Amino acid sequence: MPLPDPIRVIVTKPMEFGRFFLPGPTEVRPEVLEAMVRPVIGHRGEDMERLLSGMDTALRGLFRTRRPVYVSTSSATGFMETAITNLSRGRILCLVGGAFGARFHKIAERCGRPADALAVEWGTPHTPALLREALDSSPGVYDLVTVVHSETSTGVLNPVAELAAVVREHEDILIAVDGVTSVGGARVEFDAWDLDFLLTGSQKALALPPGLALAAASRRALERAETIPARSYYFDLLEFERRAPEFQTTNTPAVNLFYALDAQMERIMQEGLEARWARHQAMAERTWAW
């Protein structure tokens, strides 16, 4: 059934908003916006189950994982808080080289979790050697490392694969990664890099409206969460895991944003992740040259 004319005019004139020359929110394609203009469905019924199950393979592919990918109606900061409140029962080492690395540290402090900042000059990456020195010099002190993969405030891409390998040298330490401006735009490998928690938001490299956060968690992360009573209610990692096989959300979702996610995941998979990463790299190089 065709959309009413006034609605169709609204969702097919994105050029009125101009081009967004900023990390996000990004320009959203008209067909993705149009996908949102559909009736709301009951989020505890078969319609929601079909919607989420239909995206399952694509979302796992996006994160390069066999683990389920959780979708939350929140900003990505919500899943940053999830990492802090669900994955540490001791002290946290936050890798800070920009505004969003600092945000991880601030969240830890606000949530009453002891945390230290391993800071580098803004515009420089954290090196594996620096992290190894920090962990080796403080044995048994830290149980969680947080890092931003693509630090939006500086443009630095941290070597997360190598940093995760350093963390894996320590049996009781987990690693949580902010991939907000990298997932969907640059290579991120949840399984191959042996990460414990990876999060992103809808409004950056996924080119969706703001309002959704996505994350994946390792078995190690879930085992850690089971030992922490005060995990948060809204951002309880175990509840996300419990709902995942049912293809249900933990709380009332923004259904129409899920429609947009479904439409955009179809576009991303049609393009192919490798091709999408290459396209982003080519655009970056053209911008740097200009």
Where are these regions (language model features)?
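Active-site-proximal loop->helix
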Residues: 103-114
